[in-house]
Amino acid sequence: MEKIFNYINGELVEPLNNQWLDNYNPSIGEVYSLIPDSTKEDVENAQKAAKNAFPIWINSTIKERATVLQRIADLILERQDDLAFAESVDNGKPLALAKKVDIPRAATNMSFFASAILHENSESHQMSQVAINYTLRKPIGVVGCISPWNLPLYLFTWKIAPALATGNTVVAKPSEITPMTAFLFSKICIDAGLPKGVLNIVHGLGPKVGYEITKHPNIKAISFTGGTLTGQKIAEVAAPMFKKLSLELGGKNPNIIFADCDLEKAVSSSVLSSFSNQGQICLCGSRIFIERKIYKVFKEKFLIKVKSLTIGDPLEKSSKIGALVSQQHMEKVLTHIEIAKKDGGVLLAGGNKFIPEGRCSNGYFLEPTVFEGLSYDCSTNQEEIFGPVVTLTPFDSEEEVLNFANSTKYGLCSMVWTSDLKRANRMSLKLDSGIVWINCWLVRDLRTPFGGMKESGVGREGGSYALNFFTETTNVCISYD
């Protein structure tokens, strides 16, 4: 059986304890590879390698760093088919989605930040007849990057690219549930000529590896994407140590449909924002609020499209809905579905485990599920389910839907569908969201800030925000006298 290895000091190495964890293919429900069950000692070796590599990496020129990152981006695209296949097998997502979104965006992350550091501006402030100030931005040193299982390579590169670009060295932990593309990425780094120790990847469990990365005194910053509860635990450990923290956490995002919208576009996009990646995207719009005068027609059109989605083998071109990432996660989502039923939810579509014919009959598949008749403040509309489950709720006014939308502890993103520009501006101002999409969803410009309010996280990623996070600022004041 294939083994995944840690990537430490430029080498692919076994865990020091020679202990391994099972890695499942969720579409067939079987173990297909083994990953390191790494411990404190592996993290220690990784941080030592990163610490030793830092003087070399920081003294490389910006152009040299950019060249290596761009070479990595090019190799990702050259190996796109292999990476997409690995992502689909490891995660359960449709192969077509991995080819179209995950892998190309991973390459774009690397190339974007390779280019960004070549065009970054510095600041200066002149004090008339007195002095001039200018600002230096310096890499932090060794930083930790912990990435999730839903968009494995995409979000892994989203973190390490700006960290490396700004001159830091990295100890990274990909999710133990979907480690394969990070392992393949380590081979790409070797082939691209990334200096030894600049990036170190330690596989294993969060309570072991993630905890050790978070609490290590030589790791000066933590960038984490994942669940809110895990983010809280990271903050509890890292904050007293005065580490820089970037936490991109959960979401329970409202999708608001006004009567004056482009209905066909709103319906089609709402299907995507509900069920892409089996609803396992922090940006999915799981609470759909529809202005009452178009509620019935929206519901009819939406359900027709939902019921036409093809569920099945992720490797088949026709499959739009793949497997959930694990049996444990599938059971969690099924529990939420039962809670929604007990709370009086009317099941309009789905609600059951799906058993495909053929090789995937033991996989972790769920039907896309739609409820109506639930109160805006019930647990289904308040807790992040992170699966193919959405609710439909009518509203009568802007004031009412704003109350619905802002009622959760989360504040990651919102979608608003309207042809009224003034309304769009009013809603954007009043929604508790780090991102507001007007008449679209998941349109991303990597220069823009990405992150949420409330319990959806701390800080922002993307563009200059990411570059600033991974650097420390020094102001230099020079007297004219």
Predicted regions and their residues:
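Rossmann-like NAD(P) dinucleotide-binding subdomain of oxidoreductase/dehydrogenase enzymes
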Residues: S122-K265, F395
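ALDH superfamily catalytic-core signature
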Residues: A221, L229-S375, I438
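Conserved C-terminal structural/oligomerization subdomain of aldehyde/semialdehyde dehydrogenase
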Residues: I28-L34, I219, I256, T310, ...
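Residue-level signal for inorganic ion chemistry
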Residues: G29, R65, E87, M110, ...
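Glycine-rich loop-to-alpha-helix module at the N-terminal edge of alpha/beta enzyme cores
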Residues: E30-E120, V130
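Terminal low-complexity tails and localization/encapsulation signals of metabolic enzymes
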Residues: M1-L34, T67, R71, N121-I146, ...
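Structural signal for hydrophobic packing residues in well-ordered secondary-structure cores
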Residues: F54, I58, A73-Q80, A84, ...
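Short, well-ordered beta-strand elements within core beta-sheets of diverse protein domains
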Residues: V31-S38, N52-N59, C145, N255-F258, ...
